[in-house]
Amino acid sequence: MASRFDRPLRTASLRFVDLETTGLRPDRGARITEMAVVDEGGVRYDWTSSHDPPRDEAVAAQLPQLVAHLDDGIVVGHNLSFDVRFVTYEAERLGLDGIDVCFIDTLGLARRVLARAGSYRLGAVLAAVGAAPEEELHTAVGDALATRTLFWRLVERGGLGTLADAGAKRLRWHGR
């Protein structure tokens, strides 16, 4: 029986995601300030808080929209565990539903494909594969676009053909 991860990468609906935050730890008060989802057609979703720190009601209104843009695709992000930690923390704190998605982390993929890279920060691995960012890094849209470029360069370098080859996994978290 074929696994859902046997699907060719070129035919998968990929959603490249990034968040920007006020800090590193949501449990110590850091909050989401920007969220973006990009696909092969461009920016699907882009939100930036107009308040510092972001208001709970704004984040509560935006998280379901973010998840809706991820539900029908394979989520791809760089150091995705960081973003997932913030999304799950905020969703739990605000009483929102959980998520059930398949994902690929380009950080792990870069460590596999570029085994001798000196740094695995997004800008460094982008440069290591000979690519430049389309937009400014350290913005949600800029990093999501850079992740898309990085992903396809890693796929090419690694000779990867399927979701399984790229290390796709399933993430299930149920809120409320």
Question: What function would you assign to each model-found segment?
Answer:
Residues 100-111:
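A short, structured active-site edge motif that brings together acidic residues
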Residues 1-9, 148-176:
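Acidic two-metal-ion nuclease catalytic site recognized across multiple nuclease folds
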Residues 80-84, 107, 144:
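Alpha-helix N-cap/helix-start capping motif
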Residues 1-101, 115-116, 120, 124-138:
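Conserved non-catalytic scaffold segment of RNase H-like nuclease domains
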Residues 136-153:
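A charged, well-structured terminal subsegment
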